[in-house]
Amino acid sequence: MAASAATTQATLLLHKQLRDLMKNPVDGFSAGLVDDCNIFEWSVTIIGPPDTLYDGGYFNAIMSFPQNYPNSPPTVRFTSEMWHPNVYPDGRVCISILHAPGDDPNGYELASERWTPVHTVESIVLSIISMLSSPNDESPANVEAAKEWREKRDEFKKKVSRAVRRSQEML
């Protein structure tokens, strides 16, 4: 019965967040359901932040919510090409607020930096936009991208420019 109550809470909360975003869109991204029958899987398009290497890009991602949301974080995976130190090669986003609550077993993050149930779709996507503006190369998900970011910035810029161009071609 508890799983059913958690699913009901998650469903109600996600419907509310979707309604709020439809009523009051936020600059920098758009969001909706992948399939109208599944509130737990969202399609998000993030507009590359102005004055960054990602400026002009339109990057698609899938946000998948667990049945016990908001007690556990969603996963976010770019489906568009993305070259970034904090995005795994398979597109999964690696930022602190998407990590399960509690202490970090690796000691990189404070518990206060990790997931809390107060986060919303809006706060998650705004954190991803901030990540695009300011990569964290100290605990990278994509070691090669982080190394290029630090040591071969021109190569890094070329790969990001290619990803931006490809995202524009997909429109």
What is each model feature region?
Residues M1-L171:
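UBC/E2-like fold recognition across ubiquitin and ubiquitin-like conjugation systems
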